[in-house]
Amino acid sequence: HYRWLASMAGVGNATMRLKSDDIFYCCLPLYHNNALTVAWGCVLSAGATLAIDRKFSASQFWDRIRHYDATAFTYIGELLRYLLNRDATPHDKSHRVRLITGNGLRPEIWQQFQKRFGIERIYEFYGASESNIGFINAFGVSETAGFSPLPFAIVEFDADSDEPVKNTKGHLIKVKKGGVGLL
């Protein structure tokens, strides 16, 4: 229950800020966290409408968006790349979607997707149902998974041994700011 409340507060209230007249489209299976916790949490926090579809279809996606008159949707992984790889049409911006949220949007297609389909805001996040921390792009900064209000550390990682690096006392070593490591 805490995760639903956190999702309503973090993704719903603080980030997407849906209105009661918004329609949030979801074509993901409800057993997926992005559908059940994120999409549902966002609409519950705003008193908005959740339009649930049976499945994702790249060829029918924008027709389904228009059918439901959606103003927002959630995505995972390569879904946006599949949409972008379809031939452009004069109807690419013929919809009311202004906000989307999800995870796995590749930085190299972020701006292209946003421009082609006329999406005002993309709220990318990073996290997992089994993790104890998450990151969200609450400020709408392009090509980033955002920040976390919770304390965390990134530690050095040895890719050859597939193990975190430890100092002489056996403690993990934090990377310097901007460094690459293990969360």
What feature does the model see in each segment?
Residues 6-23, 31-71, 86:
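Conserved AMP-binding/adenylation subdomain of ANL enzymes
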Residues 45-48, 67-76, 84-159, 172:
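Gly/Ser/Thr-rich phosphate-binding loop
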Residues 23-26, 183:
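Short, well-ordered beta-strand segments
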Residues 154-183:
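Conserved beta-loop-beta connector loops within the AMP-binding
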Residues 28-32, 174-176:
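AMP-binding (ANL) adenylation modules
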Residues 3:
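Ca2+-coordinating acidic residues in Ca2+-binding motifs
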Residues 28-29, 53-54, 76, 102-103:
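Glycine- and other small-residue-rich loops at beta-strand/loop junctions that grip anionic moieties
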